[in-house]
Amino acid sequence: MPEPGPDAAGTASAQPQPPPPPPPAPKESPFSIKNLLNGDHHRPPPKPQPPPRTLFAPASAAAAAAAAAAAAAKGALEGAAGFALSQVGDLAFPRFEIPAQRFALPAHYLERSPAWWYPYTLTPAGGHLPRPEASEKALLRDSSPASGTDRDSPEPLLKADPDHKELDSKSPDEIILEESDSEESKKEGEAAPGAAGASVGAAAATPGAEDWKKGAESPEKKPACRKKKTRTVFSRSQVFQLESTFDMKRYLSSSERAGLAASLHLTETQVKIWFQNRRNKWKRQLAAELEAANLSHAAAQRIVRVPILYHENSAAEGAAAAAAGAPVPVSQPLLTFPHPVYYSHPVVSSVPLLRPV
């Protein structure tokens, strides 16, 4: 067998060596994108859940089979979805307890009695009166363990609040009168200590009398509270004496006024007021007389005398009649003025209107 020569050894060394094996792949992190996207495949299978507890034992084998089928379906859903449905039941949710009595009121019950379930009702006076007593009674009535027939019957409504019905049936005038009576009783109680108990009782009967009086007091009542002026009636002898004194003196001194009041059995204030009124009347009379005189003088100044003139064609008519042979009457002027006529108005001064022909 021939030995390999040096050329064969050189060719063997010139051949490339095989590549080294690749390094092992790094261990995948559980937080890699692939694991996050396909996390359901690496999740361990869920543990079998015990069957749900039932409040009542199944009555028959069919009920037991139905419960087993429901448990199997629940396990299948948990395996497919990747989470346990029982964990949802362990979450704590807030409980909302709504009393059923607020939603169980029949419709006709609310329609027949709007006064007890609504704390503010319209009164005939036009204002809103709070009804705390009515609302409290309504709550007590709702909370009481009454049967359905008692709740639906309208008889408790008719007997519930007779006081409120009486208050609603009264007119605003009656309410105002009652309040004014209570205010008067309060004033009497303050004035007389012996009647303090009665006034306190009347005030307690109407606690909102003061507030009502502020709102219901009308402007028509205010003028009635003013003191009416008294009118003094003088006798004929007193008027005659006062008139004679006024003719002599328009103004009296304090001593003269005191003496006249003593002689006529009057007060000085009455005499003073009579003289003031008499002077005002006298001034009005003077003003009226002066105005009448001015009007008469102005009317007299405006009068203008207008003479009646003859017609200008009287001469032509006379000539025509003479040509016809008829006797011609001599026409005379209707009015003749020996002196020229002047205006009596002061603006027009000495303007002659007509001179004799």
UniProtKB/Swiss-Prot annotation:
Compartmental location: Nucleus
Composition bias type Low complexity, residue spans: 191-209
Ranges annotated as biased composition (Pro residues): 16-27
GO molecular function: DNA-binding transcription factor activity, RNA polymerase II-specific; RNA polymerase II transcription regulatory region sequence-specific DNA binding
UniProt keyword Nucleus present: yes
Highest rank taxon of the organism: Eukaryota
Residues of the DNA-binding region: 227-286
UniProt keyword Phosphoprotein present: yes
A single cellular component GO annotation: chromatin
InterPro entries: HD, HD_metazoa, HMX_Homeobox_TF, Homeobox_CS, Homeodomain-like_sf
Protein's job: Transcription factor involved in specification of neuronal cell types and which is required for inner ear and hypothalamus development. Binds to the 5'-CAAGTG-3' core sequence. Controls semicircular canal formation in the inner ear. Also required for hypothalamic/pituitary axis of the CNS.
Protein name as annotated: Homeobox protein HMX3
